């Protein structure tokens, strides 16, 4: 970049942003709200779709996203590179380096994603065999795959704008645009699938969502970041080395993570059938959807950790990061436990009101739902550590989760075959859940060691408070089961919702009396006042 462009870049940054503190609280709160809404739409879609296209077609739809998740691994883990280094360059006001890095990344992803789409198009016969595409869905399945793969690969290139906003800690803005996209998708699914478009309708709704979301993020980035300047002429070999070095580690780790996160569907598809893959998706839908709320913490941890590491002096850096980890793990674990405790202890009532008479294989689905709910609790305990370590550039530490997971899978999956004397959906699901729990424990021990966190402090501040929601859910488990199975689907849904609210109140009371410190108790005591103010504001606005 020449001197004139550098001067222009530096002067374009508003003075108010030169000493702007991290927006961690706003980012977390906004992300939680957006993900809560997303969770509602994701939980609401499957019963509607299942009733109209059947389990086989639904299994094919989930398999399409299994394919695109692996295609997304081809981009050198570049999103994490963007977020980490934009956060660091922003902390040091080195915007010329940020533009160079972003331009270099864009110069890689555009041709690479174009080549991947061409390969999928030309090699369709091989792809159809890989997906076990049923003959009854040969035409609409091909159209859906090409639409989803095309827009997904285009979105990977355009993620440069979203990731730049995340690196600048403007995560709240990203969440607004993401919300607009998935709400539009939800409405279109109801219209298109309800109108008989089937899998094609699902693909078309996903296309509309991505165009809306990425278009808004691109517009906002150009509008709010005057220093942003992207051009192939800014690509540099030094930036390419940064992408390959850090991104390459993330890439390999992401390959293992994607394999682990999708292994139950992949094994069910290969060893049983496409309907088994669909059943796995149903069993994991609630745990995965509700996990998006505590994941709001993790999305903010990576740029915040990078900013904290870059702005802290050598004497306080370690303590700041370890304290940050304990606080983040404490609150994200409590959030996870609130949801997972209900899903683990109220399994059948939830499935009964969710799927109704259309529930496929109730006995197997109930046991899988329980197994994935428990394993999700352990899996989410790894999130704060991996996000902070990525923010510190220590991506290799994540191998303490993925490698043990693969080792445990190599043991538990064959054991499931020996126990059931056949490859079964239930056996595969339980084996995967057990491997997740064991490997999560390995990583938690490693993170405590690397960040120099006291094991006693971790148990006292993170693990023990996380047991309280399970005690609360257990108190209500029998009344919820007994009541729900005797009522209709919609009445039962009201019971589950009311029980969930009561569960939250009991959990908060138990935490207040046993686990919260003085500052946290003071914050909790302000909740009624804040709710009252919000209701008063809403009443005034309505008048």
Give the residues covered by each predicted segment:
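Membrane-proximal transmembrane or re-entrant/amphipathic helices at the cytosolic face
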Residues: 1-15, 448-460, 477-543
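N-terminal membrane topogenesis motif
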Residues: 1-43, 96-104, 138-143, 217, ...
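Interhelical loop/hinge segments that connect adjacent transmembrane helices in multipass membrane
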Residues: 2-24, 199, 203, 217-261, ...
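Signature of the first transmembrane helix
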Residues: 23-88, 104, 117-121, 151, ...
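Transmembrane helical elements of multi-pass membrane transporters/channels
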Residues: 26-43, 205-217, 221, 237-307, ...
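Membrane-interface helix-loop junctions in multi-pass transport and translocation proteins
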Residues: 50-52, 56-57, 172, 183-215, ...
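Helix-loop junctions and terminal segments of transmembrane helices
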Residues: 76-92, 167, 226, 283, ...
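Interfacial segments at transmembrane-helix termini and the short loops linking adjacent helices
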Residues: 124-148, 342-377, 451, 455, ...
């Amino acid at each position: 970049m020449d001197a004139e462009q550098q001067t222009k870049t530096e002067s374009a940054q508003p003075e108010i942003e030169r000493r702007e503190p991290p927006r961690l609280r706003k980012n977390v709160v906004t992300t939680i709200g957006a993900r809560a809404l997303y969770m509602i739409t994701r939980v609401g879609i499957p019963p509607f779709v299942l009733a109209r296209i059947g389990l086989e077609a639904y299994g094919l739809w989930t398999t399409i996203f299994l394919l695109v998740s692996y295609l997304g691994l081809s981009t050198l883990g570049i999103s994490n590179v963007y977020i980490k280094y934009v956060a660091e360059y922003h902390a040091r006001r080195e915007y010329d380096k940020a533009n160079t890095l972003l331009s270099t990344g864009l110069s890689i992803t555009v041709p690479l994603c174009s080549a991947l789409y061409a390969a999928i198009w030309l090699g369709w016969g091989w792809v159809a065999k890989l997906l076990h595409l049923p003959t009854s869905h040969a035409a609409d399945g091909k159209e859906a795959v090409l639409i989803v793969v095309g827009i997904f690969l285009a979105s990977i290139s355009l993620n440069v704008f979203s990731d730049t906003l995340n690196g600048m800690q403007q995560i709240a803005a990203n969440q607004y645009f993401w919300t607009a996209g998935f709400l539009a998708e939800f409405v279109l699914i109801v219209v298109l699938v309800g109108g008989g478009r089937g899998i094609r309708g699902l693909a078309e709704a996903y296309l509309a969502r991505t165009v809306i979301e990425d278009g808004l993020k691109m517009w906002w980035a150009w509008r709010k970041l005057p220093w942003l300047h992207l051009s192939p002429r800014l690509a540099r070999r030094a930036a390419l080395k940064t992408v390959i070095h850090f991104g390459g580690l993330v890439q390999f780790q992401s390959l293992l993570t994607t394999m682990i996160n999708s292994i139950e569907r992949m094994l069910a598809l290969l060893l049983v059938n496409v309907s088994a893959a669909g059943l796995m998706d149903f069993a994991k839908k609630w745990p995965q959807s509700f996990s998006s709320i505590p994941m709001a913490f993790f999305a903010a941890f990576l740029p915040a950790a990078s900013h904290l590491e870059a702005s802290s002096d050598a004497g306080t850096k370690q303590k700041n990061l370890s304290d940050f980890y304990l606080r983040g793990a404490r609150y994200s674990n409590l959030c996870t436990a609130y949801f997972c405790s209900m899903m683990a202890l109220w399994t059948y009532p939830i499935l009964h009101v969710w799927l109704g008479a259309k529930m496929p294989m109730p006995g197997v689905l109930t046991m899988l739902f329980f197994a994935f709910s428990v394993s999700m609790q352990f899996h989410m305990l790894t999130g704060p550590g991996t996000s902070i370590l990525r923010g510190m550039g220590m991506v290799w530490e994540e191998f303490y989760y993925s490698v043990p997971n693969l080792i445990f899978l190599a043991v538990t999956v064959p054991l499931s075959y020996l126990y059931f004397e056949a490859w079964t959906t239930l056996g595969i699901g339980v084996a995967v859940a057990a491997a997740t729990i064991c490997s999560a424990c390995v990583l938690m021990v490693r993170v405590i060691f690397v960040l120099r966190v006291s094991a006693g402090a971790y148990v006292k501040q993170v693990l023990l408070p996380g047991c309280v929601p399970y005690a609360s859910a257990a108190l209500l488990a029998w009344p919820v089961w007994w009541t729900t199975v005797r009522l209709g689907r919609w009445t039962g849904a009201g019971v589950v919702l009311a029980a969930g609210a009561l569960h939250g109140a009991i959990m908060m009371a138990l935490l207040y009396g046993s686990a919260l410190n003085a500052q946290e108790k003071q914050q909790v005591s302000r909740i009624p006042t804040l709710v009252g103010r919000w209701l008063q504001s809403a009443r005034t606005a309505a008048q």
